């Protein structure tokens, strides 16, 4: 099995390095990751400037000022030959639950892999301690996928409780929960008295019902949420068409 491994925390982050070491026990792994932390970069793609890569002493490839999406795009189309069998993003330092997934560079890296035609996993740890637990979970999931391929055409967003492996209670297939809108802005000044602003923490949980990823991880279960690239709200199309037909009295005459 050939694995392209990326993340949004940076090429030397403990999560990606722990996972790379575990995966190399049974697979060929090429790390292609940002040279620095790019958390929260979502699906950003660098189009206005060239990108430079650097191969580190251990064979990992660092993309200078690249986003996670850049890294997967370059990994698939230029830097990993032969191409990978699967794209994995992680292990992220901290969870990617609920509507956090729309901001997550980790999830975006997996989404780019899926968009380019490959099976893809995003793996996050609900903390920054037990990376070995998340690595073991990922390896087990990969072996299961190898033995019985899941041809769902979806990204699997995996969130692992930050506990020893022996404390994991099992798997749960979940849906994304949601948060209240975030509103906090932290105001500061630079040494010259100019204003600075920091984006504050995420909003509090709004929907953390039993079937959500929030609830699964809080209860000690591994949350596995199938995600898709198609953002169309298919159930709303009929209502939208009816509304347009009813309120647009001018029809096609502009």
From Swiss-Prot:
- Give EC number(s), comma-separated: 3.1.3.5, 3.1.3.6, 3.6.1.11
Q: How is the cofactor bound?
A: Binds 1 divalent metal cation per subunit.
Task: Report the domain of life of the source organism.
Answer: Bacteria
Keywords recorded for this protein, A-Z: Cytoplasm, Hydrolase, Metal-binding, Nucleotide-binding
Needed co-factor(s): a divalent metal cation
> What GO CC annotations are associated with the protein?
cytoplasm
Binding sites annotated in the UniProt record for a divalent metal cation: 8-9, 39, 92
Q: Does the keyword Acyltransferase apply?
A: no
* Localization terms from the record: Cytoplasm
Name the catalysed reactions.
Answer: a ribonucleoside 5'-phosphate + H2O = a ribonucleoside + phosphate; a ribonucleoside 3'-phosphate + H2O = a ribonucleoside + phosphate; [phosphate](n) + H2O = [phosphate](n-1) + phosphate + H(+)
A molecular function annotated in GO for this UniProt entry is: metal ion binding
Q: Does the keyword Cytoplasm apply?
A: yes
Give the top-level enzyme category.
Answer: hydrolase
Family of this protein? Belongs to the SurE nucleotidase family.
The UniProt function text for this chain reads: Nucleotidase with a broad substrate specificity as it can dephosphorylate various ribo- and deoxyribonucleoside 5'-monophosphates and ribonucleoside 3'-monophosphates with highest affinity to 3'-AMP. Also hydrolyzes polyphosphate (exopolyphosphatase activity) with the preference for short-chain-length substrates (P20-25). Might be involved in the regulation of dNTP and NTP pools, and in the turnover of 3'-mononucleotides produced by numerous intracellular RNases (T1, T2, and F) during the degradation of various RNAs.
Protein's name according to its UniProt entry:
5'/3'-nucleotidase SurE
Gene giving rise to this polypeptide: surE
């Amino acid at each position: 099995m050939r694995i392209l491994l990326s993340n949004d925390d940076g090429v030397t982050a403990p999560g990606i390095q722990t996972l790379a070491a575990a995966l190399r026990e049974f697979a060929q792994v090429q790390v292609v990751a940002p040279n620095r932390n790019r958390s929260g970069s979502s699906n950003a793609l660098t189009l206005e400037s060239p990108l430079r890569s650097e191969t580190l002493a251990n064979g990992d490839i660092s993309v200078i000022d690249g986003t996670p999406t850049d890294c997967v795009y370059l990994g698939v189309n230029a830097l990993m030959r032969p191409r990978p069998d699967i794209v994995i993003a992680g292990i992220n330092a901290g969870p990617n639950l609920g509507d956090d997934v729309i901001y997550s560079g980790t999830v975006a890296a997996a989404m780019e892999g899926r968009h380019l035609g490959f099976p893809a996993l995003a793996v996050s740890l609900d903390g920054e301690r037990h990376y070995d637990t998340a690595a073991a979970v990922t390896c087990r999931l990969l072996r299961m996928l190898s033995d019985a391929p899941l041809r769902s055409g979806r990204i699997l967003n995996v969130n692992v409780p930050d506990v020893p492996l022996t404390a994991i209670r099992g798997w749960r297939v979940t849906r994304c929960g949601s948060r209240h809108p975030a509103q906090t802005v932290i105001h500061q000044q630079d040494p010259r008295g100019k204003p600075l602003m920091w984006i504050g923490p995420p909003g509090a949980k709004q929907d953390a019902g039993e079937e959500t990823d929030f609830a699964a991880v809080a209860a000690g279960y591994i949350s596995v949420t199938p995600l898709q690239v198609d953002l169309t709200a298919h159930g709303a199309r009929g209502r939208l068409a009816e509304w347009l037909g009813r309120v647009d009295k001018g029809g096609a005459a502009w």
